[in-house]
Regions:
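C-terminal hydrophobic helical "lid"/dimerization subdomain
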Residues: 3, 7, 12-14, 292-342
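Glycine-rich beta-strand-centered segment in the early N-terminal region that forms part
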Residues: 38-54, 65-104
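N-terminal Rossmann-like NAD(P) cofactor-binding module of classical short-chain dehydrogenase/reductase
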Residues: 99, 229-232, 254
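NAD(P)H dinucleotide-binding glycine-rich loop of Rossmann-like/cofactor-binding domains
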Residues: 100-166
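Glycine-rich NAD(P) Rossmann-fold beta1-alpha1 loop
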Residues: 143-144, 169-176, 236
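Adenosine-nucleotide cofactor-binding segment
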Residues: 183-239, 296
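Glycine-rich phosphate-binding loop and adjacent beta-alpha segment
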Residues: 238-304, 339-342
Length: 342
């Protein structure tokens, strides 16, 4: 892809650092590279990236078998926050702090693991008052997805007095934010995880912990004992099957992920005999109006207060490749944010 004309692009240095993933046969080379500004796409908004974050999808984007990356070479990073240095449309002011996530960022369009980015205007969300760029990436796609899940459940009728709520994959990015969001809104939250050191979830507000085995066991029964008023499920697979089979009459499961697989092993019985709803949560193509609304909520009444002190790790751009390897190996937990540049 070619960049803007030199006259238009002087706001970006001739060269800058970026993590570039290049497919070579069945291998993906991941290296911190000095990039040329002409490598950036032709998009209206130039951003000096200050912060990004690590997501499971980023790890898949640099995996030979991930089936996520749609171009090579690619700067991965499905989240970014930083400062506008130029907007060719004139809608944004230089110096304005913005965030970008979803759409094709870090998948079919160079993403957040570089010191500079160019993105379409209609992907950009001005960071609401009350949040800084670092705060936005502490939440990132994971926090946004957690908020979409909680709001989706409440819009489907969930309320704290209806009973306990299950959060699956609770030590992951979506899960840990969902635990705190639900707990601070008055819900009794039970957190499920396969990680051995998960007591910090109790400090986020979880009422109790469940093992992954308890919430992902296969079953031939179409229905099980009604236990949950609702569930936030970023895992998928047999976990979704368990959640739906054990959700109470009229409850809902908000499904946003597939780390546990795509076969959920369900019959129609929970839906037609208990009125259970399975809500699809998509953070990638969320319309911009809804996106802005959710970020306003995350800056105000939905803002988590304890995630940073309990579950956030900060790394440099030079350590991103190693962090992605850890995620692929199943070693990641909590939120990892990336400080880009100075």
């Amino acid at each position: 892809m070619t960049g803007m004309t030199p006259e238009a692009d002087v706001v970006i240095p001739d060269t800058f650092l970026g993590l570039v993933a290049t497919q070579r046969g069945h291998e993906v080379d991941r290296s911190l590279t000095e990039m040329d500004r002409e490598q950036l796409p032709d998009s209206e908004v130039a951003i000096r990236v200050q912060w990004s974050s690590i997501n499971y999808k980023d790890a898949l984007a640099v995996s030979p078998d991930g089936k996520v990356a749609q171009m090579s070479p690619l700067v991965p990073g499905i989240d970014l926050a930083g400062e506008v240095v130029e907007d060719l449309s004139g809608n944004l002011e230089p110096g304005e702090t913005v965030l970008v996530h979803g759409y094709g960022l870090g998948v079919s369009h160079h993403g957040g693991f570089a010191e500079y980015a160019r993105v379409p205007l209609d992907w950009v969300v001005p960071i609401p008052s009350g949040l800084q760029a670092r705060d936005a990436m502490m939440l990132g796609t994971a926090g946004f997805t957690a908020a979409l899940s909680v709001l989706g459940l409440e819009e489907a009728g969930l309320a704290p007095d209806q009973g306990p709520v299950l959060v699956a994959g609770a030590t992951g990015g979506v899960g840990c934010v969902a635990v705190e969001l639900l707990a601070q809104r008055g819900y009794e939250v039970w957190a499920s995880t396969g990680k051995p050191d998960a007591e910090w979830l109790l400090d986020l507000g979880a009422a109790g912990l469940l093992t992954r085995e308890e919430t992902s066991r296969p079953s031939t029964r179409p229905l099980e004992r009604q236990r949950w008023a609702g569930c936030v499920d970023p895992v998928g697979g047999s976990t979704t099957g368990y959640a739906v089979r054990t959700t109470r009459y009229g409850g809902a499961v908000a499904l946003s992920g597939l780390t546990g697989g795509t076969d959920v092993g369900l019959t129609v019985h929970p839906f037609i005999l208990r009125g259970v709803s399975l809500l699809g949560i998509d953070s990638v193509q969320t319309p911009i109006g809804r996106r802005q609304e959710v970020w306003r909520r995350l800056a105000t009444d939905l803002r988590p207060r304890r995630i940073e002190e309990l579950g956030v790790r900060e790394i440099a751009l030079s350590h991103v490749a190693g962090a992605l390897e850890s995620v692929l190996a199943g070693l990641g937990s909590g939120r990892t944010i990336v400080k880009i540049g100075q």
